From Swiss-Prot:
GO terms for molecular function: rRNA binding; structural constituent of ribosome. It comes from Stutzerimonas stutzeri (strain A1501) (Pseudomonas stutzeri). Residues 38-80 are annotated as: Disordered. GO terms for biological process: translation. The gene is rplD. GO terms for cellular component: ribonucleoprotein complex; ribosome. The keyword Amino-acid biosynthesis does not apply. This is Large ribosomal subunit protein uL4. Belongs to the universal ribosomal protein uL4 family. Pfam families: Ribosomal_L4. Part of the 50S ribosomal subunit.
């Protein structure tokens, strides 16, 4: 299949990487697994056994007329423990490499189908100036965009850093969430070739 390149001749790309069917279930699984892997999972609360104190019973078992109490650290007491206290846990979800790559191929193919993938010969700025990049993107009619190149250009990265709804990634740093989060994905020809190498 062919991909149109802005201001240049169309390039030939593999159907396997950019022309496959959209597998929504697989993409959903990849996105959930990716986001779950970013969760800290270190939340911890104290149960009645973790709270300091409460060893001596507050009053004797019988004779006071009050309900019996064995500790001041039970969940119904102020300063007591939590009934079902949160414990540190690993939220990571396993996703096979083959499935992850298939999900990325599915996303790229859907971007092509929905005309959200903008291919350019090259994309760079001369200096790390946000104004210059904003002007360049406005000229292309892009405001909410992910810029993907084969290697991150320092000037481009610094220029985009202060722009909302604009992100710069290299091919290796692209993930399912970033690829679907933006209205458009601006990608260089060299990045297209690299995606083909990695996912082909």
């Amino acid at each position: 299949m062919q991909l149109n390149v802005n201001g240049a001749q169309a390039i030939e790309v593999s159907d396997r990487t950019f022309g496959g069917e959209f597998n929504e279930t697989l993409v959903h699984q990849a996105v959930v697994a990716y986001m779950a892997g970013g969760r800290q999972g270190s939340k911890q609360q104290k149960t009645r056994s973790d709270v300091s104190g409460g060893g001596k019973r507050p009053w004797r078992q019988k004779g006071t007329g009050r309900a019996r109490a064995g500790t001041t650290r039970g969940p119904i007491w102020r300063g007591g423990g939590v009934t079902f206290a949160a414990r540190p846990q690993n939220h990571e979800q396993k996703l096979n490499k083959k499935m992850y790559r298939a999900a990325l191929r599915s996303i790229l193919a859907e971007l092509v189908r929905s005309e959200r993938l903008v291919v350019v010969e090259d994309f760079a700025v001369d200096a790390p100036k946000t104004k210059a990049l904003a002007s360049k993107l406005n000229g292309m009619g892009l405001s909410d965009v992910l810029i993907v190149s084969d290697a991150v250009d320092q000037n481009l990265y610094l220029a985009a850093r202060n722009l909302p709804h604009v992100d710069v990634r290299d091919v290796q740093g692209s993930d399912p969430v970033s690829l679907i989060a933006y209205d458009k994905v601006l990608i260089t020809v060299s990045a297209v070739k690299k995606f083909e190498e990695l996912l082909g």
